[in-house]
From Swiss-Prot:
GO molecular function, one term: electron transfer activity
RNA-binding keyword on record: no
Name of the molecule in the record: Ferredoxin
Taxonomy, superkingdom: Eukaryota
Necessary cofactors: [2Fe-2S] cluster
2Fe-2S ferredoxin-type domain: residues covered: 3-93
Length: 97
């Protein structure tokens, strides 16, 4: 399946289609959008965003705890879309602050 991903970035929103077996960060880059990242392995908070609508599968990540995920935080480098999804990007400071 392919879902619509909307990223709300500091430069404004961007939308693109993302297959459910491609990480959102990878697909965003494929579409020409630059997002923050560091490890690309779900082990840090550089790429953190916040899901405001829809659902993702980020079971490949290990940095976020259950409370953070319940609050909507997502690591875009290990997140697969599970529905049409809206994510606010550049949330590392909010997460770690």
């Amino acid at each position: 399946a392919t879902y619509k991903v909307k990223l709300v970035t500091p430069d404004g929103p961007v939308e693109f289609d993302c297959p459910d077996d491609v990480y959102i960060l990878d697909q965003a880059e494929e579409e020409g959008h630059e997002l923050p990242y560091s490890c690309r392995a779900g082990s840090c908070s550089s790429c953190a965003g916040k899901v405001t609508a829809g659902t993702v599968d980020q079971s490949d990540g290990n940095f976020l705890d259950d409370d953070q995920m319940a609050d909507g935080f997502v690591l875009t480098c290990v997140a697969y879309p599970q529905s049409d999804v809206t994510i606010e990007t550049h949330k590392e400071e909010e997460l770690t602050g």
